[in-house]
Every structure is written in C-alpha cells, then in structure tokens.
C-alpha cells in the first residue's frame, strides 16, 4: 500500500516511533496476512461509516488494509448528533456549498455490503458470470452510487476532522 511505502521510506531517517501515516477512505487492497502486525501500528486509516469505498473489496474475499482502522462518527453512533451540524458548517465554510453527504446512507451501505457478501462470498464467485450479474443487480436495486459516493468526498473527511476530537473516533 502507499501508506506502507511512505512509512518504509522514512524508516532510515528516524525511528519507527517518530513516524505516523494517516490515510483517509482507504480501501482494502492487499491479500497479505500481516496487515495488523505491530510494524504497521503507526498507520491510521480514517474512514466514514457511510463511505462504501473503504469496505471494498470485501474482507471475506481475502482483502485487508495495513494499520489501525479509525471510524468517524456515523449515523446512529452516540457522538454523531453532537457533531453533525458542526461538520456541515465546516464543510460549507471550506467548500462554499452545502454538504451533499447523506449520513443515513450508512444503513444502505451496511445492507449492500452484507448482501454482497452473501451473494458473492468469495473472490472466485466475483469473477464468475453469476457474480458479475449479481454485483450489477445489487447496484441497481436500493443503492444510489452517486449519492453514496458523497460520503467519500475529501471535503466530508476534512470537515469531520476539523470538528471532532480523537475520542470521537471509533476503532475496529
């Protein structure tokens, strides 16, 4: 992963304790099984629960991401209601437009990921004709990909990071 490459490149310059890498909206892109080793504890993946991108490819297909996963407040979380209006204001201040992100899409994203895992449980199933057809059907029913991608906007992540404290992040 890029985060791993960056932190590896800095290791000759300083000790590992002095290197931290923060990523945003990081998909699961490796099939190596060492992604949670202590060596990668300095990589922090900040993710939005309503963002589909960090949930793909599916972990059940054998994919993972390096480092520690930290989730922004999401619809239904205890800290969400306390911070959402502040996030919207920060977004508008930064971008000059209202925030199009729909946090309630978290339920649709959760349902889509669950259904996808049931219908296409393995990577081999994905590349089959039935897997491709199932994927297209899943996207066509009940999920507006353009609207869901609003949760992936960098401006949404930046606005959230401006209004929360470290305690507001949920680890997984």
Indicate residue ranges for each PLM-predicted region:
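A phosphate-binding catalytic loop at a beta-strand-loop-alpha-helix junction
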Residues: 1
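Alpha/beta hydrolase fold serine-hydrolase catalytic domain that processes acyl esters and thioesters
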Residues: 4-172
């Amino acid at each position: 992963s890029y985060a791993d490459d960056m932190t590896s490149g800095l290791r000759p310059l300083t000790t590992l304790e002095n290197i931290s890498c923060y990523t945003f909206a990081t998909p699961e892109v490796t099939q190596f099984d060492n992604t949670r080793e202590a060596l990668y504890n300095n990589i922090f993946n900040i993710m939005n629960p309503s963002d589909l991108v960090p949930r793909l490819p599916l972990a059940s297909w054998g994919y993972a991401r390096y480092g520690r996963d930290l989730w922004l407040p999401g619809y239904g979380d205890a800290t969400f209601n306390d911070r959402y209006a502040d996030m919207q204001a920060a977004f508008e201040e930064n971008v000059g437009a209202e925030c199009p992100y729909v946090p309630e899409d978290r339920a649709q994203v959760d349902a889509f990921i669950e259904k996808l895992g049931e219908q296409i449980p393995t990577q081999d199933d994905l590349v089959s004709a039935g897997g491709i057809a199932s994927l297209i059907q899943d996207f066509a029913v009940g999920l507006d990909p353009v609207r869901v991608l609003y949760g992936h906007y960098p401006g949404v992540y930046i606005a959230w990071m401006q209004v929360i404290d470290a305690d507001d992040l949920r680890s997984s």
